[in-house]
Amino acid sequence: MRIYNTLTQQKEAFKTLEPGKVRMYVCGMTVYDYCHLGHARVLVAFDVVTRYLRHRGYDVHYVRNITDIDDKILRRADENGEVYTDLTDRMIRAMHEDEAKLGVLSPNEEPRATAFIDDIIAMIQKLIAGGHAYAADNGDVYFAVESFPDYGKLSKKKLEDLVAGARVDVQEAKRSPADFALWKAAKPGEVSWQSPWGEGRPGWHIECSAMSTKCLGDTFDIHGGGPDLLFPHHENEIAQSECATGHTFVHTWMHAGAIRVNKEKMSKSLGNFFTIREILEKYPAEVVRYFLVSSHYRSQVDYSEDNLAEAGRTLTKLYHALRGIVPAKEADVAETDHDRRFAEVMDDDFNTAGAIAVLHAVANDINHYRREGDEEAAKRSAAVLVRLGAVLGLLQQNPEAFFQADTGSELTAEDIEAMIQARADARKAKDFAEADRIRDDLLEKGIILDDSREGTTWRRSQD
């Protein structure tokens, strides 16, 4: 297996620190608002990484943190006129609801920053003792960037350029413009904790260093996150952690690609900013997941109605292959060429686009066997399709449930069944004009009928 390491900017053979075990940390949400499409990309990307590593037999210990104290959180709580913990608790519940709909498995641990204040303070004390941090007169504590010669090794930024660029916003308490806060002195009315430097709260970067090393040890296998976190957040994590522990922080750094909307950067100012909730009001959750998985995790993804519609159509093809067939028992299905091809592409830096192509090849086999009347071969291939789909978090629904999923249609399942019965009654009475009218009315509302000798089934259009 080879994984692209942001640190070395190349694919590397993946070797775990401990045989058969993977320790992975991913930066999670700052819970001041609902999760957006960019968050969905990261959630799904590292869910697939976790699923595939487990599929390959690794014991994965996956930690994804929650930032539950931050400037943005305090500002939003103040705007809402609520206690900050009420805001964060509400947003955490919403996040869990969103990720469950997207089929994202829960991490092994989900540490919250506010539960690690003692660990954060202890790490800051280590940094001060080692000459890597200093307390300012105003109660802030800063990391001394120039004390870490390797600063910039992840982002490939030069310290002298960062210092020069930061001079426009020099704070008097800092010794160097590029230094960053480890501890922020309390402001009037803000939540704070007691520390050796007075009342205050932690900086964002030190939170992740303290949580990750506490949960996974001084050195662990994989650290991941969104593209916007590479610098300064992950760069600062490396500096803090390696100065505090004296050990290499992380072996493999992984970053998901950015999301664009209609080929433009997603931003609130452009009016193209979508929360997961807003998207799931328009599209089935599995279609959204399929859309995200269809591209390589490092690639830039363009969100558009056309692309989501295409994702819906192609996912529908896979479910069509499974419709009306009972997959063979897993124990009765040996490893196939498709399994081997799937492993080959996924071993190449989690190439989910290639894996999706394998799923469609299996679906083509199912359709071929059914045309040939070889139901047993079709059942075995269906088991392979469901098995491989599970690694991507796809194709685990009953096909009928997928086809009949309600995504905001004006018609409920009960309404549709009643209209199908009315159509059947009209056909029985040889009133074919009325039967056709009902069929056309349903089609206009996005409901497609499929007639067979066994009766009539229906599905919602994915267009």
From Swiss-Prot:
- Protein family: Belongs to the class-I aminoacyl-tRNA synthetase family.
Q: Where is this motif: 'KMSKS' region?
A: 265-269
Tell me the protein's name. Answer: Cysteine--tRNA ligase
Q: Which residues cross the membrane?
A: none
Upper lineage is: Bacteria, Pseudomonadati, Pseudomonadota, Gammaproteobacteria, Pseudomonadales
Q: Where in the cell is it found?
A: Cytoplasm
Q: Where is this motif: 'HIGH' region?
A: 29-39
Q: How is the cofactor bound?
A: Binds 1 zinc ion per subunit.
